[in-house]
Curated annotation (Swiss-Prot):
Its cofactor is a divalent metal cation. It comes from Alcanivorax borkumensis (strain ATCC 700651 / DSM 11573 / NCIMB 13689 / SK2). GO terms for cellular component: cytoplasm. This is dTTP/UTP pyrophosphatase. It is an enzyme of class 3 (hydrolase). It is found in: Cytoplasm. Its EC number is 3.6.1.9. The record marks 11, 71, 153 as: Important for substrate specificity. Belongs to the Maf family. YhdE subfamily. One of its GO terms (biological process) is nucleotide metabolic process. It catalyses: dTTP + H2O = dTMP + diphosphate + H(+); UTP + H2O = UMP + diphosphate + H(+).
Length: 193
């Protein structure tokens, strides 16, 4: 069965490649990513992953399974998405500096008229940083397309003091849950040519 990745994220593609899953990338789905009133962060992220997979399913050129995913950074009850600009990125990182926050990642697989969603919640502790140091990081541009304005797998790893949970979930695709869903949909991994 063909697996389609409904995402423009190079990090998600890299994580699927890491577990040797053959897949084809579909264009990133365009959906309304506005949280609903009183929607819990976990419910929001799961809904986004499901909606991305369903939009991807409608765009499949041939029958197969579609994987959609979403990640959000949550500080208290505030969902921090991708920054609109460097000013917003600096504001987000300033909020996160020296604090503990959650990174919620969800993955959905739609296959043969069925769908299943799994998620992870990872606690990330940031080191405290002065504004000048955060400005240097923002200027690298690394966090511009990332929830919470940082990339743990790159330069942003220096912002992190510790984490408890799924490292791959913080990157953008929780591999344990992804493998569970691939098995559920009978999609092989570890396909080394």
């Amino acid at each position: 069965m063909i697996l389609y990745l409904a995402s423009g994220s190079p990090r998600r593609a890299e994580l699927l490649q890491q577990i040797a899953v053959p897949f084809t990338v579909l264009p990133a789905p365009s959906i309304d990513e506005t949280p609903r009133s009183a929607e819990a962060a976990v419910d929001y992220v799961r809904r986004m992953a499901r909606e991305k997979a369903l939009v991807g399913q409608a765009r499949m050129p041939t029958p197969g399974a579609v994987l959609g995913a979403d990640t959000a950074v949550v500080l208290g009850d505030q969902i921090l998405g991708k920054p609109a600009d460097d000013t917003e990125a600096l504001a987000m990182l300033t909020q996160l500096s020296g604090t503990s926050h959650q990174v919620i990642s969800a993955v959905c697989v739609c296959s043969e008229g069925r769908q299943a969603v799994r998620h992870t919640v990872t606690t990330v502790q940031f080191r405290p940083f002065e504004a000048a140091r955060l400005e240097v990081y923002v200027a690298t541009g690394e966090g511009r397309d990332k929830a919470g304005s940082y990339g743990i797998q790159g330069l942003g790893g220096a912002l992190v003091e510790s984490l408890s949970g799924s490292y791959s979930g913080v990157v953008g695709l929780p591999l344990e849950q992804t493998v569970e869903l691939l098995e559920w949909a009978d999609i092989p991994y570890w396909q080394i040519d």
